[in-house]
Amino acid sequence: MINVTLKQIQSWIPCEIEDQFLNQEINGVTIDSRAISKNMLFIPFKGENVDGHRFVSKALQDGAGAAFYQRGTPIDENVSGPIIWVEDTLTALQQLAQAYLRHVNPKVIAVTGSNGKTTTKDMIESVLHTEFKVKKTQGNYNNEIGLPLTILELDNDTEISILEMGMSGFHEIEFLSNLAQPDIAVITNIGESHMQDLGSREGIAKAKSEITIGLKDNGTFIYDGDEPLLKPHVKEVENAKCISIGVATDNALVCSVDDRDTTGISFTINNKEHYDLPILGKHNMKNATIAIAVGHELGLTYNTIYQNLKNVSLTGMRMEQHTLENDITVINDAYNASPTSMRAAIDTLSTLTGRRILILGDVLELGENSKEMHIGVGNYLEEKHIDVLYTFGNEAKYIYDSGQQHVEKAQHFNSKDDMIEVLINDLKAHDRVLVKGSRGMKLEEVVNALIS
């Protein structure tokens, strides 16, 4: 993490610091006054309900090395210690992160996409970690606050920084890309997330493609070549190498399934390189192909990439498998959802042997298209050989309505507890249960009830 003096910070960003404090060392950054450790820099924000400047005095008393303070904000008479006066604390955080990133000077890999950002980030880290010192975004620290905080967690000897970039509207990824100036930019796919803000999948593709705006000259852009909506934006990328991945044969890296079972999927790249992935889902084959492309660009050997992918582990609640007694498999894919990722989950479940039980919750943030898209997920069940469909949530009722005719058994629930009770009583040996819904639905509670 960042470990510099206030004098160094003063040379990096517009600010004022009393001379007597310039030799004070800073070790780490936090925006949470409850998480202060010795010599941390505390950064307060003015929120709608709470002004973080109220906690500056306590942060300093608790051992903070210094604190940002926004000019024009009344200062408590109890504040005593190193204060860094700035025009705006958020802007100063972002400026500090950009300066520190230049100081550390790692190769930056930026990852965005409607689905699979975190999974792809995890896979890239797995591919690279034996050859480089790698640091990646933790959790969903992928916005205008989280990304700078991630950068400030880099150690001085970090060689690769993998930065996840999220957004809910236009120009947000453009800002993050300009801040981070990636060497490699990645778009995993285009789905329907944030449709209510961006209006259409075309709008989502445009917003995601902003990741190339800050791409360094002679950088690399890796993208889902199976997505037609990205092609117009690829043509706008200048002074960069563009690499398409996907199942279509016109891609630079063509991935094709060799075999799959309850332990994962085996696939081949360009009919030459064979890989074994211990994760379910054809969509994860494409995420892995992106990681392979990154490995190629950074000069890794086939054997290194193969071994590292074979041992990949993902952030929780992404196709996370639990094996219960009597050969029952529960797949926790409940971290988040979109119609696209739900269809991918259905495809994955349909390839497994045993009775296939699908548990789906609402997909949120779809705006006026929500009903139509939930109906579409239900219709997608046709000829997918799903045996049981359980749904929960107001919007998921539309999945039930359109999907019940395509399964042997279906039931919609208004209570999560009721669904859990029915499911537990219904489980049989060799069942395969897949659970998916938007983050706000908290369907991991269903998984926890099954595995506890």
Swiss-Prot record:
Pathway: Cell wall biogenesis; peptidoglycan biosynthesis. Signal peptide: none annotated. It is found in: Cytoplasm. It comes from the Bacteria. Its main location: cytoplasm. It holds the Pfam family Mur_ligase_C. GO terms for cellular component: cytoplasm. Gene3D superfamilies: Mur ligase, C-terminal domain (3.90.190.20), Mur-like, catalytic domain (3.40.1190.10), MurE/MurF, N-terminal domain (3.40.1390.10). GO terms for molecular function: ATP binding; UDP-N-acetylmuramoyl-tripeptide-D-alanyl-D-alanine ligase activity. ATP binds at residues 113-119. Keywords: ATP-binding, Cell cycle, Cell division, Cell shape, Cell wall biogenesis/degradation, Cytoplasm, Ligase, Nucleotide-binding, Peptidoglycan synthesis. It is an enzyme of class 6 (ligase). One of its GO terms (biological process) is cell division. Transmembrane segments: none annotated. As MurF has no human counterpart, it represents an attractive target for the development of new antibacterial drugs. A new series of cyanothiophene-based inhibitors have been designed and synthesized, and identified as micromolar inhibitors of MurF from S.aureus. Optimum pH is 8.4-9.0. Its EC number is 6.3.2.10. It catalyses: UDP-N-acetyl-alpha-D-muramoyl-L-alanyl-gamma-D-glutamyl-L-lysine + D-alanyl-D-alanine + ATP = UDP-N-acetyl-alpha-D-muramoyl-L-alanyl-gamma-D-glutamyl-L-lysyl-D-alanyl-D-alanine + ADP + phosphate + H(+). Belongs to the MurCDEF family. MurF subfamily. PANTHER family: UDP-N-ACETYLMURAMOYL-TRIPEPTIDE--D-ALANYL-D-ALANINE LIGASE. Involved in cell wall formation. Catalyzes the final step in the synthesis of UDP-N-acetylmuramoyl-pentapeptide, the precursor of murein. Catalyzes the addition of D-alanyl-D-alanine to UDP-MurNAc-L-alanyl-gamma-D-glutamyl-L-lysine. In vitro, can also use the mesodiaminopimelic acid-containing form of UDP-MurNAc-tripeptide, with the same efficiency, revealing that the discrimination for the amino acid residue at the third position of the peptide in the peptidoglycans is entirely supported by MurE. This is UDP-N-acetylmuramoyl-tripeptide--D-alanyl-D-alanine ligase. The gene is murF.
